[in-house]
């Protein structure tokens, strides 16, 4: 699982600037989940070959008793509890503040590695910057400038050394014996535990409410139709003997970790409840991560035909961006519709891992252009010459040509649909990248 780094500090010390630096902004997965993450952002970053998740908390007032500051403090505490590393940010220009001391008092008790970071330290002597903050009792302060990037790489590399050292590594044998990795995600009480029970069969899954979430990664191996699968813990499963207990408490961090670790995600929805923003945000995580996806609409049994039609219309309207995914109407409790659901899991995995030969891709591209050319931009019409595969899970198709920056989003979607149809890429996001050739004689007289 990707380690989680929580950025904590009083207001206006530069947490958001550091968050943007660590995630390179464009990689941010989602911001401000309504009703769930007031002033808390979740993003993904990478240092070399080591990925990580970052949580940007709101300004922390640990002694706030009520109102919005109290809510922000509660959200921050949850972020800290779900993290592997805490980066505590203070302001080098304004020096030590009483709030810093209150936050330090709280952090010393949480049992997480703490990295004390003095931001806005550009142009200042280290001894002057650090002097005030030693009294916090959190070790040597690390001086950085989030705005300019000074010291940030060294700090994050050091934090990741600690984070990855605390994670048990799977052996090569364990990795090879794993089947298709499936994450079942959804908001609480949509029936994740019931579906897990129906899939795993002989194991018992008990759902109950409990504050906090387990930090341990759990993989449950099972077979279905002679095929091996591995279920990733998404409901907060905890093994007790042969019993799996599911903590039905929604955690953004656990959901993000599970999605990024999976080969295929099953997004489970409740047919008896309206599609919520939270459902749409979880779906957005999946698309951003490029994961293969199957949607299960649970509790379909016994629904009035009019309710079924209304639910289908609601799905089509609110989850239109999931048009690449198969939707299945199931009952986990009655074990109906699960066979077709799992066949779509297999199809989505095959599509995500498909190998697309360059000659066939280029032929499909040429056919698409002959059927419908891209529009001109002024006197220039983009020329699409050839295509090759740039990656898997999700499939990436790289198209080469001239003036490709003039390609419209509408034409890009047209090409995506043509490639999907030609190569039967159902159930997986598809990325298309354009690379324009440069004219070597353009600057010569």
Swiss-Prot record:
Residues at which GTP 2 binds: 186-193, 233-237, 298-301
Pfam families assigned: KH_dom-like, MMR_HSR1
The keyword Repeat appears for this protein: yes
Binding residue positions for GTP 1: 9-16, 56-60, 119-122
CDD domains per the UniProt record, alphabetical: EngA1, EngA2
Residues in EngA-type G domain copies: 3-167, 180-353
InterPro entries, alphabetized: AAA+_ATPase, G_ENGA, GTP-bd, GTPase_Der, KH_dom-like, KH_dom-like_a/b, P-loop_NTPase, Small_GTP-bd
Sorted UniProt keywords: GTP-binding, Nucleotide-binding, Repeat, Ribosome biogenesis
Transmembrane domains' residue ranges: none
HAMAP family to which the protein is assigned, alphabetical: GTPase_Der
Family: Belongs to the TRAFAC class TrmE-Era-EngA-EngB-Septin-like GTPase superfamily. EngA (Der) GTPase family.
Assembly description: Associates with the 50S ribosomal subunit.
PANTHER family: GTPASE DER
Descriptive protein name: GTPase Der
